Amino acid sequence: MQAVIAIPELAGLVSEQQATDLVMRPVAGVPLLIRTVLTAARAGASDVLLVVPAPMSARPLQKLLGTIPRQEVRVELIQISEFDPQGHSSWIILKRHLKDEFLWLPWNWITTGEFVSQLPLVGIGSVDWSKAAYATVHEVDRESASSALPPRSAGGVAVTSPESAVAAERFLVARSGKVLDGIHTSFNRRLCRPFVTMLSHTSVTPNAVTVGGVLVSILSAIAFTNGTYWWSVLGALLFYVAGLFDEMDGMLARVTFAESPQGTWFEGFADGLSYLLLFGGITIGLHRHYGRLATVMGIALLVGAILALIATSLQRRRATNPDQPNEYLGRFYQLLEKDSGNWISRVVRQVQAFQRRGVMIHYIVLFTAIGALPLVFFLATVGAHLTWIVILYFNRRFFSQSSGVIPTVTKVKEAL
C-alpha cells in the first residue's frame, strides 16, 4: 500500500529553518514528520510518497528520514512547487508516482495506525484534505461507499502550535491501549496516562520501565514475607503498582514506536518473574502462620507457575510469527471463538481474562484487604496447574498440524 504525505509551502510564512523545525517538532518524543511516516507504516503502507515544496532544502529531511529502518517503510521524496491537494493540476504532476489507491496523511496530522487502517475508500474528489483519508483516483460506487465504516470523530489532531502538540500527545496516550482491553485494564491505563506522557519526553525506554516493575515486585515480595496483615496489604498495593509498570511499558512502546519482538518476550519474562516473586513472598509469609502445609502448597504453586510460564512461551512461539509475538493473545482468542462448539474452549475463553496481570492485580489487593490471602493462594495453585495442562491440550488441538515436533530443551531455552 502507498501513502502520500505532503508538506505545504511554508517559505512565505516562516524561514527555512523555522519550517524545518516545524516538521521536526517532537510529539511524545518522536519528530512530527517521522511520526506521520511511521503511522502510515503501522497502517499497512510499505511505500511513502513525501511531497515537499521546491524551495525547501531536502537535505535535513533526508537526514531525518534516514533514521527510519528500511524494513519499516520505503520513502520517496519529491519536490514540487506550490502543491495543492485540492488542485487537479497537482495530482497530474504526481500521476506517474501515484498508485490507484493510496493513504493520504497531512504532514502534521496526528492519528493512530488502527484508525487509518479502517478508513473507507473514497474518490479523490470527496477527500477532506485536512484529515487522513483512504483515496482512489477512480470513481467509487456510492452504495459500497455508504456501506463502508461510518466516519467517527475527528480521529486525530492537527499540530499547528505547542498547545495543539500537547493535545495530540493526550490523544495518542489515550489510545495507546489494546483492542482487547477490558474494564480493569482500561482503568489501569487511565492511571498511567500522565506518567506515560512524562516518560515519552525522556530517554527512558520501555525495557527500563519493565525493569522498574520487576524491582517494585521484589519490594512487594519482601513485604509479603512478613506475614502480618498490614505488611501483606502493603505487598498487595506494591504488586498493583508493579502491574501499572507493566501497563506503562507497553503504552510507552506504542506511543514512541519502540515496539519490538525482543521487548515483547522480555515483558513476558518479567511478568512471569513477578508472579514467581509474588508467590514466593506469600509462601514465606503464610509459612509463619500455617507451617509445613503452606510450604508444600507454595512449592506446588511455584512448580505450576514455572510450568505455566514455559508452556505459555512455547505456545506463543507456535501461535505467532517470529516478528509479531505481541499478537499471541488476539490470535489465541480468535481460535477459541472459532472453537466455541467445544465446551472447554468456551469455559477457557470466559475465565482466561482473570489470568491477565491487569486483572489479577485488582483481585490480589481485594482478597488481601479482606483477609482472604490463603484462598488466593489455593486458587492460584489450582489455576497454575490447570493453565499448563490446558495449554498443552490446546497445543495439540490447534497447533499439532503446524508443528508436530516435540519441543526440545533448546526450544524451551529459546522460548524463555
Give the role of each language-model region.
Residues 193-201, 250, 254-257, 264, ...:
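Short amphipathic alpha-helical coupling elements at transmembrane boundaries
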Residues 177-223:
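Conserved small-residue-rich
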Residues 62-134:
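Conserved beta-loop-beta/alpha segment of the NTase-like Rossmann-fold superfamily
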Residues 206-262:
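Membrane-embedded alpha-helical segments that form the functional core of polytopic membrane enzymes
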Residues 1-57:
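N-terminal glycine-rich phosphate-binding loop and ensuing alpha1 helix
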Residues 80-86, 255-262, 289:
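Juxtamembrane helix-boundary/capping and inter-helix hinge elements in multi-pass membrane proteins
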Residues 129-196, 269-416:
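A feature for the membrane-embedded catalytic helix bundles of lipid/isoprenoid biosynthetic enzymes
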